[in-house]
Amino acid sequence: MEFEGRFIDIMEVFNVDKYEFNIKLEQIKKLAAKKEYKQAAEIAKQMNWNKVKDWSTLATIINVQEAAGDYEEARDMAILAYNRNLGGRKLIYKLTEFFIKVDDFENAEELYREYAKLSAHDVNKYILYYDLRRAQDAPDTELVDILENYKDTYP
């Protein structure tokens, strides 16, 4: 009997935590709708996202953190989603952008190659590659070549 009571107490705590989590998530969404991204990002930083498996929720938080200019937090959330196989090509593209923004070119190149494989006929692979090479201070001639390849492929 005592064990049963402890189980109920634990479940009540879990439900309260879930309830509080949902309240904070709604706060974040309302702040984001009002374009108050910094405040929304601060609330998001205080929350534990490790159990969240919903792509839509994680995408919202990634977008909030990006809009607030916190690329490291946005990158970390995107990695969390990536490791759960959420988001598909769009997430890989976004994660590559975050790695570029935080000057992690090794990971950016690896993800770019993955994106290019998945997106063989997608115009965005040229744009992403251009952004990557430009951030790496590639010579102008190489950047022009990338743009010409883009133009030749998508006239």
Model-flagged regions — what are they?
Residues L95, R134, L147-P155:
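Short, intrinsically disordered, charge-balanced linker/junction segments flanking boundaries
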Residues E20-N50, T60:
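Alpha-helical segment of the N-proximal tetratricopeptide repeat
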Residues K34, A68, V102, Q136-D140:
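Structural motif corresponding to the intra-repeat A-B loop/turn of tetratricopeptide repeats
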Residues F3-E12, Q39-M47, Y71-Y82, F105-K117, ...:
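Alpha-helical repeat scaffolds
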Residues L31, Q65, F99, R133-A135:
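Residue at a conserved register position within TPR or TPR-like alpha-solenoid repeats
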